[in-house]
């Protein structure tokens, strides 16, 4: 077996590449096609743990779900997790290999390319179709040398490319024509057509522009996707844009948005719940009155802890607790709740130690070996089922661990609860995802009769909706030829 390969590249970041690939994955999966996702190189702080014990970008985990597959490290062989403005942890085939600045990674690209092509070779032998997501834009002139994320990959494996652009942000024709103009002749020949994303309005008013675009470029418009509201898909990086009005909200949750916040998909169930009002606060904002504060994960715990203090939020959180509010820390947030965070090996920056917030009697030492686990278990003492994953370098010890939050199915306990029950911490990402765990945690926070919410069912419904949208709005005959029929590089 040797799979047909189709790649989706975008004119910009957040053009809709991840969503279109997920939609196409589910569209093909519904037809019984053996399809798999692939992203050669991803940069994201939201990651997922795979069945083979590594980590990949969350978008590829969602795309795997759309294909009816468990996530695997081959679906995203190179993952970059930024830990500063100029550096990132480099994860290859699911495991960290180095922390490099931009210059260092540029030199490393040849090695990364070998890893990318090795994963590609394995996947094309296992599946009938490989749907590939590019990264950012293929027209970044300064990044073209040794490119493995966009056209460099497409040229290496000889695949066709769909170019997607977001009309909602404006300038869609300039984006498409400009991107095409900056490609080499051989790269332009790979572009099989355009998809315009997030359209609102009367399509008849757009039609003259589409006809001009096809005449100007000689490339077909494969379809115009509407702006879809209420999608329940794991985000790779972007947090929700603006507040969501919830007339039925009865529980107020505040989340400090840290500079290196990671795995904020932990908040998805709260954001989706009609009775929970989630307020994300950023620099310069005060902590408003609320029932629950959630300290999220962080790729740089000590640096984000210092930043939190600089905002004046430590005193605000202490005031929140004095008035009976609840506080939950997840992963890096758990580490911040302790008494000390030690980084003797310089895992997240310069070696050193930082005083924690001191609301849980524990200390954390960052270790070179990263813990990666997919786990299930139960909340204590309620017994509510939980499922999720661990991604952390920290090893926590201390008296607070004698009051664990979770009993895991593998025999370990996890997390800690303060003596007064106001403060909880856990290493488990996805702690709100299971309906029973969500109900129990909302009851602890003050919403005793919360309406049931099943996040997994919402995600499945979204994937079905995306597949329906593709079928209704894209050129299905052309997509069928590209994925199942004609030679890859037909002009």
UniProtKB/Swiss-Prot annotation:
What is the organism field in this record?
A: Xanthomonas campestris pv. campestris (strain B100)
PROSITE patterns according to UniProt: GATASE_COBBQ
Presence of the UniProt keyword DNA damage in the record: no
Q: Name one GO molecular function term.
A: catalytic activity
**Name of the protein this chain belongs to:** Cobyric acid synthase
Q: What sequence ranges are listed for the domain GATase cobBQ-type?
A: 250-437
Xref: NCBIfam families: cobQ (TIGR00313), PRK00784.1 (NF001989)
What CDD domains is this protein classified in? CobQ_N, GATase1_CobQ
Q: Where is the active site?
A: 331, 429
Stated role: Catalyzes amidations at positions B, D, E, and G on adenosylcobyrinic A,C-diamide. NH(2) groups are provided by glutamine, and one molecule of ATP is hydrogenolyzed for each amidation.
Annotated PANTHER family? COBYRIC ACID SYNTHASE, DETHIOBIOTIN SYNTHETASE
Question: What biological-process GO terms show up in the record?
Answer: cobalamin biosynthetic process
- Metabolic or biological pathway, per its Swiss-Prot or TrEMBL entry: Cofactor biosynthesis; adenosylcobalamin biosynthesis
Entry's family note: Belongs to the CobB/CobQ family. CobQ subfamily.
Entry-linked InterPro entries: Class_I_gatase-like, CobQ/CobB/MinD/ParA_Nub-bd_dom, CobQ_GATase1, CobQ_N, CobQ_synth, GATase_3, P-loop_NTPase
Q: Which UniProt keywords apply?
A: Cobalamin biosynthesis, Glutamine amidotransferase
């Amino acid at each position: 077996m040797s799979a047909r390969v189709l790649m989706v590249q975008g004119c910009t970041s957040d053009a809709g590449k991840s969503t279109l690939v997920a939609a196409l994955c589910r569209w093909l999966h519904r037809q019984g096609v053996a399809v798999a996702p692939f992203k050669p190189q991803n940069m994201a702080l939201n990651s997922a743990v795979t069945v083979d014990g590594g980590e990949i970008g969350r978008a590829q985990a969602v795309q795997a779900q759309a294909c009816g597959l468990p996530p695997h490290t081959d679906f995203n062989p190179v993952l970059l997790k930024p830990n500063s403005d100029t550096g990132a942890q480099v994860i290859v085939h699911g495991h960290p290999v180095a922390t490099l600045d931009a210059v260092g990674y540029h030199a490393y690209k040849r090695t990364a390319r070998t890893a990318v092509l090795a994963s590609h070779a394995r996947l094309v032998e296992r599946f009938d179709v490989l749907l590939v997501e590019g990264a950012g834009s293929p027209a970044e002139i300064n990044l073209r040398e040794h490119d493995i994320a966009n056209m460099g990959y497409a040229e290496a494996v000889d695949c066709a490319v769909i170019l997607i652009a977001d009309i909602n942000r404006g300038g869609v024709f300039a984006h498409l024509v400009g991107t095409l103009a900056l490609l080499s002749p051989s790269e332009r020949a790979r572009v099989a057509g355009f998809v315009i994303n997030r359209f609102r309005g009367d399509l008849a008013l757009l039609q003259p522009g589409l006809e001009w675009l096809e005449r100007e470029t000689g490339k077909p418009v494969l379809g115009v996707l509407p702006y879809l509201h209420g999608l329940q898909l794991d985000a790779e990086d972007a947090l929700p844009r603006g507040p969501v009005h919830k007339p039925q909200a009865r529980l107020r949750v505040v989340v400090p948005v840290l500079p290196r916040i990671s795995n904020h998909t932990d908040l998805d169930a709260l954001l989706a719940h009609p009775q929970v009002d989630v307020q994300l606060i950023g620099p310069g904002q005060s902590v408003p009155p609320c029932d629950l504060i959630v300290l999220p994960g962080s790729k740089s715990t000590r640096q984000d802890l210092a930043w939190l203090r600089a905002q004046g939020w430590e005193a605000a959180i202490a005031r929140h607790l004095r008035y009976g509010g609840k506080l939950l820390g997840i992963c890096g947030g758990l580490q911040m709740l302790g008494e000390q965070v030690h980084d003797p090996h310089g895992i997240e920056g310069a070696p050193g130690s930082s005083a924690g917030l001191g609301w849980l009697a524990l200390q954390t030492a960052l270790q070179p070996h990263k813990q990666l686990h997919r786990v299930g278990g139960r909340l204590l003492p309620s017994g509510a089922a939980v499922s999720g994953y661990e991604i952390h370098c920290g090893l926590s010890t201390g008296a607070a661990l004698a009051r664990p939050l979770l009993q895991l199915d593998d025999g370990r306990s996890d997390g800690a609860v303060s003596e007064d029950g106001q403060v909880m911490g856990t290493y488990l990402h996805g702690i709100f995802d299971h309906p029973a765990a969500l109900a129990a945690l909302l009851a602890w926070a003050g919403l005793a009769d919360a309406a049931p919410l099943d996040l997994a069912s919402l995600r499945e419904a979204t994937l079905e909706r995306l597949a329906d949208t593709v079928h209704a709005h894209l050129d299905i005959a052309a997509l069928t030829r590209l994925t199942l029929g004609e030679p890859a590089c037909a002009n």
